């Protein structure tokens, strides 16, 4: 039964269509089986005519097919190569290669070719034969899998509906009826409620569906967990309008995410580096809610290539794993810190340790003028800290970066040394880089403990500024490790991460088209906030060829969930991408903008791994307070504040600005 498919998400109409196709398939197979039986009967008739009867006497020199006598001189040329029987000339069938077979052997070969038996004779020895229509038929009739979180009431309800051929559908409808009591169901353009549209599609996970019904997750407590004092739109079905005449399409990146068996619950032992959930419990629960499908224009002629797996959210990672610390003395050889390495935040999925940084790292540097190559010889480490103090255990390894390049192509890693605080590596890394460019770089060594399931612990780091080293001399050095320097003062981080050109426009509810998708907030009708992502300039190269495959992701804080998230298409192989894409947020009142913040982050797309952070901005009033509460994300400064205030001051007009990208989304000091 493991072959049975889960087709409970199909609608009644879709199931009826599938059953009609299966009916036609059954009729065709029966007709084909009838044809095969006729051919087999013809073969049996030929064999019957050539069979010897016990009532008659036959000579040894007779034809095995027609029983006619053969001459006295019998040669091997009269023997069939298929059955080794003597056959007369009349019972032979010539083949294309000049050889011949008897009528029976030739008919058997013809029958196998015509019926495909030659294929099934081989297939049955390797596979258990079961047609696709049989599997679908069983899948449509089977009882759906038991939900781990199924209540007793749902279980009893299901038992009373065992006679229904689609038992899963009625349970889903009952759940939707219960949800409809909790909140008002908005209406779509078609006149049907969002839940009715969802019921018709039955949780279809196909990313490129042309269905006009859109998913609507409307539980206010799930959408706005942090924003209880402010009004919020009752519907999260987004309509995005651009200042252009391109057509609108559905571009929700969440469909592909939920297409990938997201209902499987992993045990902690099954977690890997790429699937560790670093978000708080309430955020993790929100991720189970399917987001809206939004129409995004302009720039819709470009295929939506951003349906990737959910990348790490930078603010949550920073909030969970970064703490401010002061750099200790380089000569002391040790420093106390609570660690959170921003350099490894994206490649190692966070730091899970809290250790006292101790020890040194020994290495040598050499620059080969002929090949323009930096050669790094990582020798050993001395007296590292224990990642597990109770068990006195450390599994250290060393990573190197030539800052500001933090891409995967720029990372080098040693092997992992088990159960030692004095690891001996003796490994060599090479960077092909010109002498002039190398002088602008900073070589960073970071030591990590390799934990189970990717839960790595930061053990310390050290830096070498390349402009202070004479490249014509070999450098042998042993540096003390120290805690992570805060990103604001780190000399390895670039001062310029690029620029993002955006335009903002707020349209009051009174100016929205009559009869359109006008959403209401608690205080009345809400307006529409449009964010036009035009282009980015001089982004950081994240690929080995000096380019990036970038896209922009946006959140309208404090709502950090899938209903608030927007993405642009991916612009490949360029550091100056033109996105020409618009985000639209409905149901926003003008007075709400005082407590909101628009966060835009630029990412490099990595298909088989987590994405690389390239920079970001936050647009808001920059007071540090939202709805009377102190928040980290209300930290806009300079042009970020000016552009936001200009948009608020002139409703209905576009406010455009060029914003410097931040190197990290850590809270900035206000008043700068």
From Swiss-Prot:
Record PROSITE patterns: C2, RABBD
Matching SMART domains: C2 (SM00239)
Residue ranges of every copy of the C2 domain listed in the record: 357-479, 508-634
Residue ranges, annotated region (Disordered): 199-222
A GO molecular-function annotation: phospholipid binding
Membrane topology of this protein: Peripheral membrane protein
Entry-linked InterPro entries: C2_dom, C2_domain_sf, FYVE_2, FYVE_Slp4, Rab_BD, SLP-4/5_C2A, SYTL1-5_C2B, Znf_FYVE_PHD
Transmembrane segments: none
Occurrences of domain RabBD (ranges): 4-122
Tissue: Detected in insulin-secreting cell lines.
Keywords: Cytoplasmic vesicle, Membrane, Metal-binding, Phosphoprotein, Repeat, Zinc, Zinc-finger
Gene Ontology CC: apical plasma membrane; endosome; exocytic vesicle; plasma membrane; secretory granule; transport vesicle membrane
Stored Pfam families: C2 (PF00168), FYVE_2 (PF02318)
Keyword Cell membrane among UniProt keywords: no
PTM-bearing positions, type Phosphoserine: 201, 204, 217, 221, 274, 489
Zinc finger motifs (FYVE-type), residue ranges: 63-105
Function: Modulates exocytosis of dense-core granules and secretion of hormones in the pancreas and the pituitary. Interacts with vesicles containing negatively charged phospholipids in a Ca(2+)-independent manner.
Quaternary structure annotation from Swiss-Prot or TrEMBL: Part of a ternary complex containing STX1A and RAB27A. Can bind both dominant negative and dominant active mutants of RAB27A. Binds STXBP1, RAB3A, RAB8A and RAB27B. Interacts with MYO5A.
Name of protein: Synaptotagmin-like protein 4
Species of origin: Rattus norvegicus
Upper lineage: Eukaryota, Metazoa, Chordata, Craniata, Vertebrata
